[in-house]
């Protein structure tokens, strides 16, 4: 009985060993039949967790650009300060130029002129470009302290100007129409003009002036 039990145990262990070996051989055959895939290395086209983390860190580093922009802000403020100073200088120059003005008549029309400004008038005959002209019909001259009112003109007062160009005004369309006559006319006209620049106002000092009076002090 002891010998038979020993033989049975040996057979059982031998069969188990055979089953294990058969399983191992089947796994080896399967591994040989299927291509080996290394899970440690990621396939091309897919991101591993390490690369995804590095890409995320790259995006977090992007705010450095915003830091550089913040550092450049003081330069823009300096530029704005320079522009403001230039504007103040221009306003001071305009104030100096507009200390005096005059009202003149050219071609039956009245114009308010300031030294340094340009003006479009009707075509001045026999006037070429860069010619210096003198306008004698001065109706009024005004300064900060006095006003010279002409009766009808301010005697000895003259306005000096320079001819800059001879041109044409914008086109004016003239349309003619007659009902039930099939009459239509569309005509365009451009009036010739002259551009002059005022250089100075002189000769008004000898004319009797009236002091400037505030509106509240006028006696009616």
Curated annotation (Swiss-Prot):
InterPro entries referenced in this protein's UniProt entry, alphabetically: bL21-like, bL21-like_sf, Ribosomal_bL21, Ribosomal_bL21_CS
Cellular localization per UniProt: Plastid, Chloroplast
GO cellular component: chloroplast; chloroplast envelope; chloroplast stroma; nucleus; ribonucleoprotein complex; ribosome
Keywords: Chloroplast, Plastid, Ribonucleoprotein, Ribosomal protein, RNA-binding, rRNA-binding, Transit peptide
GO MF, one annotated term: mRNA binding
Domain of life, source organism: Eukaryota
Keyword field contains Transmembrane: no
Biological process terms in GO annotation: chloroplast organization; embryo development ending in seed dormancy; thylakoid membrane organization; translation
Bilayer-spanning residue ranges: none
Record-linked NCBIfam families: L21
Purpose of the protein: This protein binds to 23S ribosomal RNA in the presence of protein L20.
Family: Belongs to the bacterial ribosomal protein bL21 family.
Subunit (UniProt): Part of the 50S ribosomal subunit.
Protein name stated in the entry: Large ribosomal subunit protein bL21c
Lineage start: Eukaryota, Viridiplantae, Streptophyta, Embryophyta, Tracheophyta
């Amino acid at each position: 009985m002891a010998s038979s039990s020993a033989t049975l145990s040996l057979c059982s262990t031998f069969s188990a060993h055979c089953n294990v070996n058969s399983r191992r051989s089947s796994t080896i055959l399967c591994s040989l039949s299927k291509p080996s895939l290394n899970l440690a290395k990621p396939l091309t086209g897919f991101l591993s967790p390490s690369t995804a983390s590095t890409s995320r860190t790259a995006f977090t580093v992007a705010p450095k650009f915003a830091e550089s922009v913040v550092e450049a802000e003081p330069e823009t403020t300096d530029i704005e300060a320079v522009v403001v100073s230039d504007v103040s200088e221009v306003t001071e120059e305009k104030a100096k130029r507009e200390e005096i003005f005059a009202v003149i008549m050219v071609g039956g029309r009245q114009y308010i002129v300031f030294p340094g400004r340009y003006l479009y008038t009707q075509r001045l005959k026999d006037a070429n470009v860069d010619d210096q002209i003198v306008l004698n019909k001065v109706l009024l001259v005004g300064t900060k302290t006095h006003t010279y009112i002409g009766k009808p003109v301010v005697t000895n007062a003259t306005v000096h100007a320079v001819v800059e160009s001879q041109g044409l005004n914008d086109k004016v369309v003239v349309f003619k129409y007659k009902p039930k006559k099939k009459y239509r006319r569309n005509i365009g006209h451009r009036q010739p003009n002259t551009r002059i620049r005022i250089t100075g106002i002189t000769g008004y000092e000898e004319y009797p002036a009236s002091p400037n009076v505030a509106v509240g002090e006028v006696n009616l």
